[in-house]
């Protein structure tokens, strides 16, 4: 174990089929994109339904360090008004703390291009292992200077903005194979460049393309003009004044719905999540289709004007054979938990980039599946999970690696495997501040 055996959380066993409605907080991906775009405007923007979690609080802290005001409504802390600096330039000679938040460490450096002095970036010790170089290479191509205070291409570092930004259209080439956030981080700020941006991804594959599409849609919604050629892996952005509408409502986090909706397949019964959008740019929007392939019954009833995603299972799970999860790798841990109980093996592929997430998620998933008696192995680009007899599975103290999705993965296994205890379940605060209460509440309904 690499974490102290303190604050163990006994994952509750599902004593009966579920019948629960679970309200999921706002999307982290959308929340942090909207916060960046609001900071790039010239007028205040009120964000309604903003996720309040460690990652979004870190983002607001980073923006406030740069001189952006983030005023939390006294009546509800999920309503936040963002006011850009009056000068139109963010502050330099400041320190930005990223924690372990990929969206903070990869989106906020772009804002430093427009600062009036150098900006220092640091984070949790575990964040020093997360790759950063592609987005920083991109900023260097735009004229910024990056000084590393540790390993090149990783936190901590200082960004000094250029004396002048490129007047003509900037040409930037990076290899974003390790994370779609490198592309998104540059696209979010590109409209503010005097000549716009032509961005090329030089890698063979583009990870999590839906997240990039989300960024493009959000930039467009703030007044940007983006031409995406996904087959050529290029994005061309025109210079535009950016301004989100005065009020923006954040969709629920559909990836965070995965443990709850997936619970219906593991424990049997029905779980409903309200406010499910008809259309969405979130990769989690693919989740209902994936669960259906695994044997769930999925429907989208509208009750009192609210659209729900309703998932019903009977405790049986269909394995998926070779299953390409390139489009939605962030829900791989939740799907892996379900597939531990499947009737045949599954090769989840297209998710090699998960090795660079909060932890090496592929290695972590293999370790923890084996820890409870399951069968799994890493593949070059993914993960293989094979069925084992039910009596082979057993309780264990499960590691979370300071990774919120590994904590929810362990909780899902605990629905069906007795005596699972989870180390540091509080790591779920990264995106679900009250995960333990929500999980217990689902089982009590």
What are these regions (language model features)?
Residues 1-445:
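Short, structured segments at the rim of ligand-binding sites
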């Amino acid at each position: 174990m690499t974490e102290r055996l303190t604050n163990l959380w006994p994952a509750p066993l599902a004593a009966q089929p579920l019948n629960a409605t679970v309200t999921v907080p706002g999307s982290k991906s959308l929340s942090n994109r909207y916060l960046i775009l609001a900071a790039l405007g010239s007028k205040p923007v009120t964000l309604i339904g903003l996720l309040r979690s460690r990652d979004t609080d870190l983002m607001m802290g980073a923006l406030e360090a740069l001189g952006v005001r983030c005023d939390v409504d006294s009546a509800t802390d999920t309503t936040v008004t963002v006011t850009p600096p009056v000068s139109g330039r963010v502050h330099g000679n400041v320190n930005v703390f990223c924690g372990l938040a990929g969206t903070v460490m990869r989106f906020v450096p772009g804002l430093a291009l427009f600062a009036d002095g150098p900006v220092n970036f640091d984070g949790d010790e575990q964040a020093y292992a997360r790759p950063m170089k592609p987005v920083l290479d991109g900023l260097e191509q735009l004229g910024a200077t990056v000084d590393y205070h540790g390993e090149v291409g990783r936190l901590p570092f200082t960004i000094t903005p250029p004396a002048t930004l490129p007047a003509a259209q900037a040409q930037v080439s990076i290899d974003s194979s390790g994370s779609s956030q490198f592309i998104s981080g540059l696209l979010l700020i590109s409209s503010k460049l005097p000549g716009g941006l032509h961005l090329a991804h030089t890698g063979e594959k583009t990870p999590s393309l839906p997240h990039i599409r989300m960024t493009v849609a959000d930039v467009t919604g703030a007044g940007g003009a983006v031409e995406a050629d996904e087959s050529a892996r290029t994005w061309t952005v025109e210079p535009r004044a950016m301004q989100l509408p005065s009020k923006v409502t954040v969709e629920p986090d559909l990836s965070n719905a995965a443990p709850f909706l997936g619970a219906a397949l593991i424990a049997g019964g029905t779980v409903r999540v309200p406010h499910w959008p008809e259309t969405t740019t979130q990769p989690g929007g693919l989740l209902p289709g994936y669960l259906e392939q695994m044997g769930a019954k999925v429907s989208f009833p509208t009750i009192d004007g609210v659209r729900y995603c309703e998932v019903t299972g009977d405790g049986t799970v269909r394995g998926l054979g070779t299953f390409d999860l390139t489009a939605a790798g962030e829900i791989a841990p939740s799907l892996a938990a379900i597939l531990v109980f499947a009737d045949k093996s599954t090769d989840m592929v297209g998710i090699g980039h998960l090795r660079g997430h909060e932890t090496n998620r592929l290695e972590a998933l293999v370790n923890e599946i084996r820890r409870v008696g399951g069968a799994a192995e890493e593949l070059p680009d993914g993960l293989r999970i094979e069925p084992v007899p039910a009596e082979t599975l057993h309780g264990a103290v499960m590691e979370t690696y300071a990774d919120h999705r590994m904590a929810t993965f362990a909780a899902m296994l605990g629905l069906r495997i007795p005596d699972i205890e989870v180390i540091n379940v509080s790591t779920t605060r990264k995106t679900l501040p009250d995960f333990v209460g929500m999980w217990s509440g689902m089982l009590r309904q």
